[in-house]
Every structure is written in C-alpha cells, then in structure tokens.
Amino acid sequence: MKLSILVKAMKRNNGFRYDYCIAECSEHFLDDVCKPVCIDKGYSDGGCIGLAPNFKCCCKK
C-alpha cells in the first residue's frame, strides 16, 4: 500500500517537478554534475532523483 502511494505521487509530480531526465546517475555522475548539465541545457535546476539504485539525472523547467 505505501509503495503504491509513493509511486502515484512520483508519477503525478515526478519527484519535485523535474520533468526531463537526461542520464543515469552513478558514483561519478551525481547532483554536483547533474545540476550544471541541466542549467547548461536551459533548465533552472537539476538533480539525481528516483528509487535506489536507479537514480536518474532530471531537470526542472
């Protein structure tokens, strides 16, 4: 039940409204790399989001 609620919440707002995922995050590609890449692409913010171990670098408008 709790997982179902979490999945529905993530589908509704994709984490924190990060709507464009550009890459898989790894130990060498974390928030400190993801955020500048998103900003360079014209987005306002970026971060590694998702459920472990499948974090994705996603950008926010």
From Swiss-Prot:
One GO BP: killing of cells of another organism
Top-level taxon of the source organism: Eukaryota
Pfam families for the chain: Defensin
UniProtKB keywords: Antimicrobial, Disulfide bond, Fungicide, Plant defense
Cysteine disulfide partners in this protein: C21-C59, C25-C48, C34-C57, C38-C58
Family under the similarity heading: Belongs to the DEFL family.
Protein name: Putative defensin-like protein 72
Protein's organism: Arabidopsis thaliana
